[in-house]
């Protein structure tokens, strides 16, 4: 089953936290970038780079602190108001610097634009990963997060694919 299908199943499951607005949020990401810079051609490489860094950071957290800690990070960062300190906590300062540099290299966006965009982008992506969070049982596995972390595909491929499918799904 594809990760997008797992997300759709979680959105349809009343025991899970996801909603259709979580999918809409991902499809509308381009609107968060400053005018003229938010085309799909910039979103795809941003998600490609971010997905790889997210998958690595969350896998590392899951291995060192356990699945509940990784789930809690996803839940915490799915909330509005994520700041630079939260991103430093997730990626480490050097990881965050590398993430910004790699996005800048792939998109041509300057680092200030990227730094302003990431605190808006991370909650949208994390909200999507949190769609499989069980509403009443915090210990229940999150099939979306587990699918993201356990996939043989890179995190970047997964997020880019979900973005494309979400955009197609919402155009129907």
Predicted segments, located by residue:
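A structural "flexibility-hinge" signal
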Residues: 1-172
């Amino acid at each position: 089953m594809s990760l997008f299908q797992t997300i759709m199943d979680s959105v349809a499951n009343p025991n899970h936290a996801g909603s259709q607005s979580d999918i809409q949020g991902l499809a509308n990401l381009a609107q968060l970038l400053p005018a003229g810079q938010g085309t799909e051609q910039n979103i795809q490489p941003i998600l490609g780079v971010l997905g790889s860094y997210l998958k690595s950071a969350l896998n590392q957290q899951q291995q060192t602190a356990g699945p509940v800690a990784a789930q809690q990070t996803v839940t915490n960062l799915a909330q509005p108001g994520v700041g630079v300190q939260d991103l430093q906590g997730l990626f480490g300062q050097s990881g965050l610097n590398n993430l910004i540099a790699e996005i800048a290299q792939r998109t041509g966006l300057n680092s200030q634009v990227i730094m302003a965009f990431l605190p808006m982008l991370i909650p949208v992506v994390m909200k999507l990963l949190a769609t499989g969070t069980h509403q009443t049982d915090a210990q229940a596995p999150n099939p979306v997060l587990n699918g993201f972390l356990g996939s043989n595909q890179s995190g970047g491929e997964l997020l880019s694919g979900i973005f494309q499918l979400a955009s197609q799904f919402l155009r129907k």
